[in-house]
């Protein structure tokens, strides 16, 4: 990686194009990498202070390390993409007025699911993972945790919950058999 990164070269030159990318998550970084590699002037606007989106802020460290995410960001920077962190964009029209010829909106499609459970404490999986990643050692979620689902996110929630001090039992409830998990 360290030998290859300095050798990366822009593969072309695209005149008259200046692209703004709203969102520095996986889609925004991918778009920035491919466009800047092709010689397009690219600026990524990220409202948070770090790039990576859900991958950095939600997916647990035991699945992908911060170092791996940082390397992806460095790859994007190696091709010349510019990044503006802590920059929330509220108007595509304003970006166009600043001279951007094209705008890519890659803000993610996060819409928390809501459980139909009438009683008890229910937390959205992505909200839980984000909180566990930031404050897992100090969270108080009780000693018994039930996770609804059997996919990758449910497994991440179960594994993250098991690592929280005070949690004794984590149970998965899934509507199908183990074969379909």
Per-region residue spans from a language model:
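Ferredoxin-type iron-sulfur electron-transfer modules and their immediate structural context
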Residues: 1-18, 66, 105-123, 137
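Rossmann-like dinucleotide/flavin-binding elements
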Residues: 15-45, 84-94, 103, 110-113, ...
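Glycine-rich, phosphate-binding/catalytic loops in enzymes
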Residues: 38-39, 61, 120-122, 164
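Conserved SAM/SAH-binding beta-strand->alpha-helix loop
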Residues: 48
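N-terminal Rossmann-like dinucleotide/flavin-binding domain of flavoprotein oxidoreductases
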Residues: 51-100
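Short, structurally constrained coil/turn elements
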Residues: 77, 116-118, 166
């Amino acid at each position: 990686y360290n030998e290859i990164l300095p050798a990366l070269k822009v593969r072309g030159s695209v005149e008259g194009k200046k692209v703004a990318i709203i969102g520095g998550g996986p889609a925004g970084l991918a778009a920035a990498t491919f466009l800047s590699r092709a010689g397009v002037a690219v600026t990524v606007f990220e409202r948070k202070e770090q790039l990576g989106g859900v991958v950095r802020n939600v997916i647990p460290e035991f699945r992908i390390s911060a170092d791996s995410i940082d390397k992806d960001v460095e790859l994007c920077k190696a091709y010349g993409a510019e990044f503006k962190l802590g920059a929330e964009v509220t108007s595509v029209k304003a970006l166009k007025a600043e001279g951007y010829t094209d705008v890519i909106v890659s803000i993610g499609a996060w819409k928390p699911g809501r459980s139909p459970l009438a009683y008890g404490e229910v937390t959205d999986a992505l909200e839980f993972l984000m909180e566990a990643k930031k404050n897992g050692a100090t969270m108080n979620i009780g000693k018994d945790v039930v996770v609804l689902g059997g996919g990758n996110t449910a497994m991440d929630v179960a594994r993250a919950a098991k690592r929280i001090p005070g949690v004794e039992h984590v149970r998965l409830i899934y509507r199908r058999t183990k074969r379909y998990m």
